[in-house]
Regions:
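Domain-level detector of nuclease and nuclease-like folds
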Residues: 56-212
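Short, small-residue-biased leader/transition segments that mark boundaries at the very start
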Residues: 2-6
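N-terminal, helix-rich and Lys/Arg-enriched segments in bacterial and organellar proteins
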Residues: 7-10, 30, 102, 171
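Short, surface-exposed beta-strand/loop micro-motifs that present aromatic residues
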Residues: 7, 15-20, 154-159
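Short, His- and charge-rich active-site/binding loops that engage polyanionic ligands
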Residues: 11-73
Length: 212
């Protein structure tokens, strides 16, 4: 398994770090910590201004790639987790943090998971979250900048409770899940690692990479 930061351009922003895939013009992964205070902050509202990431050198996705494509501009690190800082909120709309998502996924179970993660952060004090698309060699492309369209997305969440680490993983195909309950989609982090080839928390023993 590869460690998270090998061979990819890693960019650090205020609220998240992104490993950027310059071929597909989307993230390999986006990682950030979400504290209880950040999860409950109401300081800044959504900016809704999608722009190219100024730290991405070379070709990048543009808003026009998504126009009339049938895909949403789906956040990896959600805007709702960035209300604690105007800069973090603004940077969450960088297109390096965005992937083409079916509207039914982006506005459905993916949004449910974002809201659930904020609840877990409130309860547990702090979460480590890594999220992104599953990168494969055969992704279809979108728009004139040939943005990769992921078939699958993942999210892994880890917390330290009473000195003991716990974690949970999720994998979603790029489709509408209707009324599927979030709980039924929980899997061990280890299962996500097998699909992505990424070792998310190398310093943690495999035994903890089980559902919270």
């Amino acid at each position: 398994q590869r460690q998270m930061c090998i061979r990819d351009r890693v960019i650090k922003h205020e609220g998240y770090t992104v490993s950027y895939n310059s071929d597909y013009k989307i993230a390999n992964w986006v990682a950030y910590e979400l504290t209880s205070k950040e999860a409950t902050s109401k300081k800044n509202e959504r900016s809704n201004k999608f722009v190219s990431d100024p730290m991405v050198k070379g070709a990048t996705a543009m808003n026009e790639d998504y126009t009339r494509s049938g895909y949403d501009r789906g956040h990896m690190a959600p805007a709702g987790d960035m209300k604690w800082s105007a800069k973090a909120m603004r940077e969450s709309f960088y297109l390096s943090n965005i992937c083409p998502q079916k509207p039914g996924l982006n506005r459905g179970i993916w949004k449910d998971l974002e809201e659930q993660a904020r609840l877990w952060a409130k309860e547990n004090g702090s979460l480590l979250i890594v999220t992104g698309p599953v990168i494969t060699d055969d992704l279809k492309r979108l728009g004139k900048n040939r943005v990769g369209i992921p078939k699958t997305f993942y999210k892994v969440i880890c917390t330290i409770t009473n000195g003991k680490p716990e974690g949970v993983g999720f994998l979603f195909d790029n489709k509408d899940y209707g009324k599927t309950p979030l709980k039924s989609m929980m899997i061990p982090i280890d299962s996500v690692e097998k699909v992505t080839g990424i070792d998310f928390f190398p310093s943690l023993p495999d035994s903890i990479e089980n559902p919270m």
